[in-house]
């Protein structure tokens, strides 16, 4: 029999679609269910579902149970707007999502116009919370923070290196690459190459030839794991021995599946891993017993629901405007990420980014290990 953590939440989702009055508060989960970033969508969905089940088991929020509805944005901005409009039409009050910054930013504007509060576990582009909207929150950090850490690390550890900054032309990828480049330039280091590639590209031979010709020995990648894995593998196949460094867009075990053994030694920034917090040991075990590894954004999504529920309780209301006000004024909230507070923009007060290295474990599998 297949184990599951989420039977109660699955029932709530069915009821929500069926139009029953069982649940009074409808939460939308806007994620890439399909497409190249579906692995991150699964993380966000599993985390939110588990946290919602915990909230419902404790009586819901202000006496009202939570139901969920899921929208597949396919990591596409236009589809994200369609999902946002559908959520608004369905009476969604709160959204957990989206993942991609390029989807989250335009969707947030639809939500603001329709009185919906949004908490993103993965949108790191600063613009998301710099729009001056009342409804934008995130449980992750920002690329101006992450890029600063990456740029300083490269400067400190790869002096006199020839550095290529490569990005995927998206608000997330190019935004992160530009923040890293900005920090390097502030420190007096000029990149050797600055290149953009297209999302979905498969053959990076021309890029790698250019990197080799320029004598590049450090490649910083602003983008996600599908392209990163191919670049890493093709660099190895074509004899380019350069250190590959990236950000939180490659924190999926799928990276190792795509890159193969060449992934070993890859570096990336991300927040401190909440799986390593002893306070989360029981929860992490529940996920693993159900056959799901709660990596990357799983617990960031869980914390989003925890913040929402506690803010609603503090506000004494499930009205999104009142909850948004409480999120900014009534913290900190007890979450799997620790005590979490939000500033006036909706950005969280979190520990800084740290560096991870991809290494082969005793089980023969590659994983990212905090340095």
UniProtKB/Swiss-Prot annotation:
Alphabetized PANTHER family for the sequence: AMINO ACID BINDING PROTEIN, LEU/ILE/VAL-BINDING ABC TRANSPORTER SUBUNIT
A Gene Ontology BP annotation from the UniProt entry: amino acid transport
Record keyword Acetylation present: no
InterPro entries: Leu-bd, Leu_Ile_Val-bd, Peripla_BP_I
Residues spanning the signal sequence: 1-23
Record keywords: Amino-acid transport, Signal, Transport
Organism: Brucella melitensis biotype 1 (strain ATCC 23456 / CCUG 17765 / NCTC 10094 / 16M)
S-S bridge residues: none
Family: Belongs to the leucine-binding protein family.
Role summary: Component of an amino-acid transport system.
Pfam families: Peripla_BP_6
Protein name from the UniProt record: Leu/Ile/Val-binding protein homolog 1
């Amino acid at each position: 029999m297949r184990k599951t953590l989420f039977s109660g939440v699955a029932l709530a989702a069915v009821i929500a679609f069926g139009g029953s009055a069982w649940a009074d508060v409808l939460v939308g989960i806007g994620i890439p269910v399909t497409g190249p970033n579906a692995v991150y969508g699964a993380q966000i969905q599993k985390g939110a579902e588990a946290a919602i089940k915990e909230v419902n088991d404790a009586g819901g929020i202000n006496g009202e149970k939570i139901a969920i509805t899921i929208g597949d944005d396919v990591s596409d901005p236009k589809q994200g707007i369609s999902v946002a409009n559908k959520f608004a039409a369905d009476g969604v009050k709160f959204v957990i999502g989206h993942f991609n910054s390029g989807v989250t930013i335009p969707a947030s504007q639809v939500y603001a116009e329709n009185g919906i509060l949004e908490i993103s576990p993965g949108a790191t582009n600063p613009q998301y919370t710099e729009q001056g909207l009342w409804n934008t929150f995130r449980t992750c950090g920002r690329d101006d923070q992450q890029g600063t850490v990456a740029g300083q690390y490269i400067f400190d550890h790869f002096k006199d290196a020839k550095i290529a900054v490569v990005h995927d032309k998206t608000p997330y990828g190019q935004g992160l690459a530009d923040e890293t480049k900005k920090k390097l330039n502030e420190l007096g280091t000029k990149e050797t190459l600055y290149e953009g590639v297209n999302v979905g590209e498969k053959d990076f031979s021309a890029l790698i030839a250019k990197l080799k010709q320029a004598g590049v020995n450090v490649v910083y990648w602003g983008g996600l794991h599908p392209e990163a894995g191919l670049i890493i593998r093709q660099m190895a196949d074509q004899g380019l021995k350069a250190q590959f460094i990236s950000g939180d867009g490659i924190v999926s075990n799928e990276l190792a599946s795509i890159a193969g053994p060449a992934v070993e030694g890859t570096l990336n920034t991300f927040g401190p891993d909440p799986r390593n917090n002893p306070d989360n040991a029981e929860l992490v075990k529940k996920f693993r017993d159900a056959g799901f590894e709660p990596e990357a954004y799983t617990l960031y999504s869980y914390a989003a629901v925890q913040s929402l529920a506690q803010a609603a309780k503090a506000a004494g209301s499930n009205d999104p405007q009142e909850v948004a006000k409480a999120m900014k004024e009534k913290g900190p909230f007890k979450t799997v990420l620790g005590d979490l507070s939000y500033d006036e923009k909706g950005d969280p007060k979190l520990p800084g980014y740290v560096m991870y290295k991809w290494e082969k474990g005793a089980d023969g599998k590659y994983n990212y290990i905090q340095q």
